[in-house]
Amino acid sequence: MVTMCGGHRPENFLHQVLTEFGEELAGEGKSEVGGGAPRSYLQVASAECWAAAPAVHVGEPVHAGGLHTERGADPVIGLYLVHRGGACQTPTVGNRQTPTLGIHARPRRRATTSLLTLLLAFGKNAVRCALIGPGSLTSRTRPLTEPLGEKERREVFFPPRPERVEHNVESSRWEPRRRGACGSRGGNFPSPRGGSGVASLERAESSSTEPAKAIKPIDRKSVHQICSGPVVPSLSTAVKELVENSLDAGATNIDLKLKDYGVDLIEVSGNGCGVEEENFEGLTLKHHTSKIQEFADLPQVETFGFRGEALSSLCALSDVTISTCHVSAKVGTRLVFDHYGKIIQKTPYPHPRGMTVSVKQLFSTLPVHHKEFQRNIKKKRACFPFAFCRDCQFPEASPAMLPVQPAELTPRSTPPHPCSLEDNVITVFSSVKNGPGSSR
């Protein structure tokens, strides 16, 4: 019977197992070595630090001399053990003699050195051992006084590798990462890169117990940036969302300013109702809106926006600053937002009733999109007056578009009364060509 010496110490338990198997090897090894005093498994494991390093878990069914375990049953580990003779005689090849290796030198792969595998299957009340070697196979079932705990099993499976390794991999003809007797890659030799074998064994353990997940959730920052792109794909969409936001607030006068064709700055000011102070926090958060509260409210929506995505997406794509003053407030407020729609600066600011939204460096958080936007913005500028006349109708207001560049362009506006798209286009482009007040 194998008892747990030292209070469930796994190394003591392995010490007993290796000792008993070492006694059998001592009887078998004399004939193999040819008269030399053989070294037992335990002696090899204590003298050579790399000799008793464990392999990974056996993932496939194991059948070896009465040792039988299926996948997912009792945990099975394999220990690669090296047995060699103590005295190395000088072999003779023809008329040439090879020099005798020193006692501390690692022998080359000869008949005096053999690789064996010790399989241990831990059950609830017993441990089954199987020794696989060249021409010898031994299997036993040994009861345990008490079953091993999870922590002790882990220490048995993956003991810490000693710091000092008396094995030169470069001069060895043994392949460091060949397939072992347990059917798993790895082995009892140090990594040729000098890394710790324990970390690789732990990775092998996790890969064998849990399958690697190829589908993983995207982090919230990336999701916010990815989802904001389709909401505001272009400059015209950004202007449209800001203008519609002012219309929903009841604005009758909307000013639109573009700096460097909208690359540096987009500013939309409207004389709407403004925003109350208690609503500042949710002003630019994703899916925060005052238009609806649930899906059933959609048939009653009478505004342009109701999803609560426009300002949040603009925050994710640019630097947004909002200046507002509610009808009930005595002084305005200037709010600076980060890319997540959170307020990072809040200061009193003189502002008339309404709200002004400033968008700086549109698409700056998307480098490829920003570069494409800068390259094509001048080409799209020619279509902007037409889009302005088509999308922005002001039946009860008199919006004006005052260009900053070039200076020779004159102010142009649409009539304050409802009219057709053709009338708007003729009015705007005739004012650009002939000046204000020209006839059609």
From Swiss-Prot:
Pfam families given in the database record: HATPase_c_3 (PF13589)
Ranges of residues in domain Histidine kinase: 230-364
Region (Disordered): 164-215
Entry comment describing in which tissues the protein is expressed: Highly expressed in kidney, spleen, adrenal gland, ovary and cerebellum and to a lower extent in liver, esophagus, stomach, duodenum, colon, bladder, uterus, lung, pancreas and cerebrum. Not expressed in heart.
UniProt biased composition (Basic and acidic residues): 164-178
GO molecular function: ATP hydrolysis activity; ATP-dependent DNA damage sensor activity; kinase activity
Gene Ontology CC terms, in alphabetical order: mismatch repair complex
Superkingdom of source: Eukaryota
Keywords: Kinase, Transferase
Name of the protein this chain belongs to: Putative postmeiotic segregation increased 2-like protein 1
Species whose genome carries this gene: Homo sapiens (Human)
Lineage of origin: Eukaryota, Metazoa, Chordata, Craniata, Vertebrata
